[in-house]
Amino acid sequence: MKDQGSSGVSPAPGEGEKKAINSELWHACAGPLVSLPPVGSLVVYFPQGHSEQVAASMHKELDNIPGYPSLPSKLICKLLSLTLHADSETDEVYAQMTLQPVNKYDRDAMLASELGLKQNKQPAEFFCKTLTASDTSTHGGFSVPRRAAEKIFPPLDFTMQPPAQELIAKDLHDISWKFRHIYRGQPKRHLLTTGWSVFVSTKRLLAGDSVLFIRDEKSQLLLGIRRATRPQPALSSSVLSSDSMHIGILAAAAHAAANSSPFTIFYNPRASPSEFVIPLAKYNKALYTQVSLGMRFRMLFETEDSGVRRYMGTITGIGDLDPVRWKNSHWRNLQVGWDESTASERRTRVSIWEIEPVATPFYICPPPFFRPKLPKQPGMPDDENEVESAFKRAMPWLADDFALKDVQSALFPGLSLVQWMAMQQNPQMLTAASQTVQSPYLNSNALAMQDVMGSSNEDPTKRLNTQAQNMVLPNLQVGSKVDHPVMSQHQQQPHQLSQQQQVQPSQQSSVVLQQHQAQLLQQNAIHLQQQQEHLQRQQSQPAQQLKAASSLHSVEQHKLKEQTSGGQVASQAQMLNQIFPPSSSQLQQLGLPKSPTHRQGLTGLPIAGSLQQPTLTQTSQVQQAAEYQQALLQSQQQQQQLQLQQLSQPEVQLQLLQKIQQQNMLSQLNPQHQSQLIQQLSQKSQEILQQQILQHQFGGSDSIGQLKQSPSQQAPLNHMTGSLTPQQLVRSHSALAESGDPSSSTAPSTSRISPINSLSRANQGSRNLTDMVATPQIDNLLQEIQSKPDNRIKNDIQSKETVPIHNRHPVSDQLDASSATSFCLDESPREGFSFPPVCLDNNVQVDPRDNFLIAENVDALMPDALLSRGMASGKGMCTLTSGQRDHRDVENELSSAAFSSQSFGVPDMSFKPGCSSDVAVTDAGMPSQGLWNNQTQRMRTFTKVQKRGSVGRSIDITRYRDYDELRHDLACMFGIQGQLEDPYRMDWKLVYVDHENDILLVGDDPWEEFVGCVKSIKILSAAEVQQMSLDGDLGGVPPQTQACSASDDANAWRG
């Protein structure tokens, strides 16, 4: 028969003389998840749960439990009394509760129920060990873990040999047991020897049972046991009928509910599958939780060492456990599935108050703590959710901050993230949206999106050609057939300009019109080629002038390629082609025939954004300059063809495609602004071009200021440069700047591959150029042009040294190449030139997941230009530094370091997750660092120490030699001398947060390992430790750490 010993909570009548069972020891034996409600509080009693306890005690299936028709599924009761018991033979703990059903309740009872949730009756310091066969043998004694012995037992006197002492511990029945605690053996360990075998035999302990030692609030050593669950023989029906027990308890509850009279129940926490007497506050709180199918949740389970662990699961069903006998009951009405395969033995049905629902918000940009710790290789799957991955695969040119940071973007105004996700599923919505947006780029890119969605398995070069056509053709003009003479073409341009302004909106959305443009392209190429052949026959000029004109040829050759790919200004392109005809290999790589008829096809079309028309005199001067340069063509063209033929077809396509967006920006200028800009820049631009040419003659000095020469030295060049339009001069200067300094980059030349929002960057560049037109100052305009060069192809000096051009692989094979930023042409025609490092390059990049090639428009500005123009540096910096991997992986890899400016060609900056736009700026509004100076991230070298109610301190952890010095110093800092050094005091606990954001007890690790992994230290009170154990609070650690390391944060060593 069970012992009827009472507790100090509510002693039974007539038993006040008996020694009360220690509440902490009772709860320690009951388990870490057991918490009885306080007396006087309101509870909810579930008869189904009570029947399950009886069935578990009688080893009977739940299906055979009888029901009781007149008993409701739950009863709201008031807890009148609570008595703690322990069996005198087995030490099994159980509780006796007296409940009284209530129809209404007062405020005090409800308040008592709420306060009961915050009370933690588990002991602060204890350890539990499952006995092994050697522990239960008659010799050898009980082996105690070292850390447990140091925390729970009094300290040994190590001056003795061997160190030993006598321990006295009391059990649940207040019986004292004496043990000899000795430290011996090889290796040495803590043992309980004398008295242990007597305890084992008296309690009839077996291997698998557990023994626990605790220190109560009075620092008394207490001893308890937990018996392992073992199958027991079923009782004979003649001795006791389980059905009669079920009917008896259900009848008593039904009678009490009908008459509002008290009734008594017994609760066995070790035998009952779940608590069936729940605090009303806990029940009401659970009912407010909106559960649904598929919801994720956590649930606490007890571990072998008396700790707790959270298991993750998913709600798979909602319904009655027994719809026939207990209809509309909340008892185990949730059907769940568990994540871990080891959790297969967990029950499949739980109650709503037993789980902790997990809110899973939608992250379009995953937080830092969801990211992998190790960098990923290109093409490897990412940890992003599936929705985000699909979003990026469909629109790889959009940056991560699209529709989040720049919600007022002029490209896609009024489109929320939800609408974009809907467009991903329905491409027709994307086409409809593109018709309402006034942007020269949207229609072409909308078509490109549909192409990607519809043909994700196409060859990358085919998709490149498709996108190139969609981006170029909307900017071409449909007009009448171009006449053969050059001047007749010039005379038609004013009329074509007005015609273009009327037709352009329809051109951007008409595919048929694009086909007509392609035909017109070929027709114009035939007429322009005739003019080219006429100019090539006039090749007779002095050879001594070849050196001075060689640099101009190099400049205009690059200029020609830009105009060929973009089709920007027809008249300028014609004059340049007359002077410097492009090699046939250039357009051959674009997929055009080698025939001379196609060598000028792209430049012959009249364009809406043409700036100024040359006069007859200018045309004749251009022809004279062309005759002057024909001799140079013979010597240079063969070399240029050889260089370009060494490039593979995809590489040339990439180089030309990246110029398209740059040319489109200028086409947005109206004629009035164009004329104003040209008149202001005319004189200054000619001087700049002459200075650049003289620079080449005098050895390529690095200082532009040294190029200023006397008027007599500039005079011989006036006849050659005066014939050129100011647009050409400005573009020529920009073309000189594009070649850059071969020494400005030390990285080998490969392709940089990354999904970047090129569309928004292009529009920013367009707005910047419009602002530049409105500025009346010539010097300011020139500074704007110099601070914003055209997007170019960088020249890397090591491209010839490390990666031979003729051995390059196709673009799709360069995904694993080094981290250089662009392709490279041969620098031999431009050796000796040195230009400012502000001339950064543009990159042709690709999404590494589907190899979809895209052209990125990078505004390569200095930091001050970025700030003064109000550009979003959060996007711009991402663009400039994006690599062949996803730029968010780069952020992870470089979050604690700075970029190397010599390798990337951009100012150093420290990156934060999300491509932070924080830029160090001085009071004057300028960047605090030079353009190429390294900027290291601020690193904390001292360790933070925090204690609630006190100001935090910072210490140098490396100056301490051991834990004792650390504890003593911290105790002095916070005015708790003597309370941290004594390991047996329970007032304060010293814990630390390691580099994995786990909270551990200071002193468990070796000192050297502790110094290397500690991030911060916290001094917790006993109440804080208990609250952490109850709530599972890890002090601000991210949620996933709670789920992953719950076995560590709530084990037997909590305190």
Swiss-Prot record:
Ranges annotated as biased composition (Polar residues): 757-769
GO annotation, biological process: auxin-activated signaling pathway; regulation of DNA-templated transcription
Location of the protein in the cell: Nucleus
Low complexity composition-biased segments: 488-510, 532-552, 742-756
Induction annotation: By auxin under dark condition.
Region (Disordered) location: 485-510, 532-565, 585-609, 701-720, 732-769, 1034-1055
Keyword Transcription regulation: yes
Tissue localization of expression: Expressed in roots, culms, leaves and young panicles.
Keywords recorded for this protein, A-Z: Auxin signaling pathway, DNA-binding, Nucleus, Transcription, Transcription regulation
DNA-binding region, residue intervals: 127-229
GO cellular component: nucleus
InterPro entries associated with the record: ARF_dom, ARF_plant, AUX/IAA_dom, B3_DNA-bd, DNA-bd_pseudobarrel_sf, PB1-like
Pfam family, one: AUX_IAA
GO terms of molecular function: DNA binding
The UniProt record lists the keyword S-adenosyl-L-methionine: no
Residues covered by the PB1 domain: 940-1024
Domain notes: Interactions between auxin response factors (ARFs) and Aux/IAA proteins occur through their C-terminal dimerization domains III and IV.
PANTHER family in the cross-refs: AUXIN RESPONSE FACTOR 19, AUXIN RESPONSE FACTOR 4-RELATED
Family (UniProt): Belongs to the ARF family.
Oligomeric form and interacting partners: Homodimers and heterodimers.
Protein's job: Auxin response factors (ARFs) are transcriptional factors that bind specifically to the DNA sequence 5'-TGTCTC-3' found in the auxin-responsive promoter elements (AuxREs).
Name of the protein: Auxin response factor 16
Organism: Oryza sativa subsp. japonica
